[in-house]
Amino acid sequence: MIKQRTLKRIVQATGVGLHTGKKVTLTLRPAPANTGVIYRRTDLNPPVDFPADAKSVRDTMLCTCLVNEHDVRISTVEHLNAALAGLGIDNIVIEVNAPEIPIMDGSAAPFVYLLLDAGIDALNCAKKFVRIKETVRVEDGDKWAEFRPYNGFTLDFTIDFNHPAIDSSSQRYAMNFSADAFMRQISRARTFGFMRDIEYLQSRGLCLGGSFDCAIVVDDYRVLNEDGLRFEDEFVRHKMLDAIGDLFMCGHNIIGAFTAYKSGHALNNKLLQAVLAKQEAWEFVTFQDDAELPLAFKAPSTVLA
């Protein structure tokens, strides 16, 4: 059978919090089958757990948060969640000694390296996928996102940014998902923001960890980072990275075709909740062997040794 995945060993890293600008220690721990993805704040006494759950997601100006019933939150979970989706990690406990996951370089790549360093272990329990059975679409003004039935996982994302630094030909990106494709094509794409917004937020004591080290920063005319872009279409690739993380908030890889126009964290989450709320639109599936499994979810050689 196709088995659930966790880590082989505990790994730790440090980074900076986007909100506070302070050092954060991140610890990734293996977890037993059927645990799911658990985010844990160890700076609170007792520690507080936040299971990945579409209904717990709140989208703020700066990041995605998980919020519990007592209005306690953990922030900036989206890029790590994308890395978990990319590598198909089903069970993990993610600890931080702060209210937020460190921003690292603004992409998912540092988290991918950390997960690969931990090693990935197959558990003796069937991996459950969410398979889309009916088309589900959500809209917000001219923005929209939808899932259609498809035996695999494809993403097609279009942005519409009127900015001199973003060429009109680099505003759409489409891909057939796989762990290899995610690592090569998506994981290194960084978040982005306007210099004036960062300066304004920092003047109000917010976004204190925001810098050229963790984002693409633009003014009204150009990219300000000395090293420029990692991809010509890095902006739309990062929006796809965000979507991959947002859609994994149900804790399961999804079998279907995702298409979006000008979508963001809030609309991606609205789509996921709309799918899950419509019982006839999806089903849980497991697979006995690789021959049945959609190509999108075959484990690459770098993942399962």
UniProtKB/Swiss-Prot annotation:
<dbReference type="GO" id="GO:0016020">
    <property type="term" value="C:membrane"/>
</dbReference>
<dbReference type="Pfam" id="PF03331">
    <property type="entry name" value="LpxC"/>
</dbReference>
<feature type="binding site">
    <location>
        <position position="242"/>
    </location>
    <ligand>
        <name>Zn(2+)</name>
    </ligand>
</feature>
<keyword id="KW-0443">Lipid metabolism</keyword>
<keyword id="KW-0441">Lipid A biosynthesis</keyword>
<keyword id="KW-0862">Zinc</keyword>
<feature type="active site" description="Proton donor">
    <location>
        <position position="265"/>
    </location>
</feature>
<dbReference type="InterPro" id="IPR015870">
    <property type="entry name" value="UDP-acyl_N-AcGlcN_deAcase_N"/>
</dbReference>
<feature type="binding site">
    <location>
        <position position="79"/>
    </location>
    <ligand>
        <name>Zn(2+)</name>
    </ligand>
</feature>
<dbReference type="InterPro" id="IPR020568">
    <property type="entry name" value="Ribosomal_Su5_D2-typ_SF"/>
</dbReference>
<comment type="pathway">
    <text>Glycolipid biosynthesis; lipid IV(A) biosynthesis; lipid IV(A) from (3R)-3-hydroxytetradecanoyl-[acyl-carrier-protein] and UDP-N-acetyl-alpha-D-glucosamine: step 2/6.</text>
</comment>
<feature type="binding site">
    <location>
        <position position="238"/>
    </location>
    <ligand>
        <name>Zn(2+)</name>
    </ligand>
</feature>
<dbReference type="InterPro" id="IPR011334">
    <property type="entry name" value="UDP-acyl_GlcNac_deAcase_C"/>
</dbReference>
<comment type="function">
    <text>Catalyzes the hydrolysis of UDP-3-O-myristoyl-N-acetylglucosamine to form UDP-3-O-myristoylglucosamine and acetate, the committed step in lipid A biosynthesis.</text>
</comment>
<keyword id="KW-0479">Metal-binding</keyword>
<dbReference type="InterPro" id="IPR004463">
    <property type="entry name" value="UDP-acyl_GlcNac_deAcase"/>
</dbReference>
<dbReference type="GO" id="GO:0103117">
    <property type="term" value="F:UDP-3-O-acyl-N-acetylglucosamine deacetylase activity"/>
</dbReference>
<keyword id="KW-0378">Hydrolase</keyword>
<dbReference type="GO" id="GO:0009245">
    <property type="term" value="P:lipid A biosynthetic process"/>
</dbReference>
<protein>
    <recommendedName>
        <fullName>UDP-3-O-acyl-N-acetylglucosamine deacetylase</fullName>
        <ecNumber>3.5.1.108</ecNumber>
    </recommendedName>
</protein>
<dbReference type="GO" id="GO:0046872">
    <property type="term" value="F:metal ion binding"/>
</dbReference>
<keyword id="KW-0444">Lipid biosynthesis</keyword>
<comment type="similarity">
    <text>Belongs to the LpxC family.</text>
</comment>
